[in-house]
């Protein structure tokens, strides 16, 4: 079978290789991936920054964002059927003993992750995974279900922000929202906040006001600010940082008002020396800072439900977030996206 692979920690080893077709073991299923999303994590692995193959193997199959069809069941699988369309979660505990609903809190070194650490991913014609980590996709969301994995991170972060913000004091009533970044995470955060009935939302990026990103922000009722030209005005009750830039994360805290909640959703590899004085001020003004990376199956379920709602509320807007689609044979193009792109997807087979 064809598979998009790398030799982990070897820069630029990306290649389409012929790999043996796997067979499902007990409690596992064989999947036929339909679409696989591409993100910055994949780029980092391709650049040799991190990643690990399954034990005893040289190659790692990429792809942790996927929607797939169940095509074969291993023994004792009773929660899905052949023909079901599903989204697999990413993380699998190895020595971690937390329940399935909390595996996103497993300590580092106690888990494996599809397409990242010790488990093959889904950028291939066939893949196996544990059946209990699958979320069924209703037919009305199949064409956008590839967005579920990045959306799960957003769901987790926003859910934590709203619940923990309220837990501090019942009268907390956030209104103004700032989302920094108009990539896939930022746009999905905008979608979720609009579904949660937030009306005063500002999204910032560096693209022109006539760009696709700016148009999509305005299309569902938010304000777009090009930070190359204009400044962000005022304080916000909730700030969602989705750029992955250390300086932007630092800047996000400057725009957080008293009693506000900041949600950091980026992977911050560009470490820089920063003045911590503003952070000390945050504590004195009752600010709450939350980070979220991996998400549990509950957040995936929330994501699928919100994709269904968003298609009803916003029509074709959600699908417009997928700006680049390539075939498996054209895989290299998926990992080279420009500033105007939002989400790149490899279409493994037709829907």
UniProtKB/Swiss-Prot annotation:
The keyword NADP applies. GO terms for biological process: non-phosphorylated glucose catabolic process. PANTHER family: GLUCOSE 1-DEHYDROGENASE, ZINC-TYPE ALCOHOL DEHYDROGENASE-LIKE PROTEIN C1198.01-RELATED. NADP(+) binds at residues 182-185, 265-267, 292-294. Catalyzes the NAD(P)(+)-dependent oxidation of D-glucose to D-gluconate via gluconolactone. Can utilize both NAD(+) and NADP(+) as electron acceptor. Is involved in the degradation of glucose through a non-phosphorylative variant of the Entner-Doudoroff pathway. This is Glucose 1-dehydrogenase 1. It comes from Vulcanisaeta moutnovskia (strain 768-28). Keywords: Carbohydrate metabolism, Metal-binding, NAD, NADP, Nucleotide-binding, Oxidoreductase, Zinc. Its EC number is 1.1.1.47. It catalyses: D-glucose + NAD(+) = D-glucono-1,5-lactone + NADH + H(+); D-glucose + NADP(+) = D-glucono-1,5-lactone + NADPH + H(+). Its cofactor is Zn(2+).
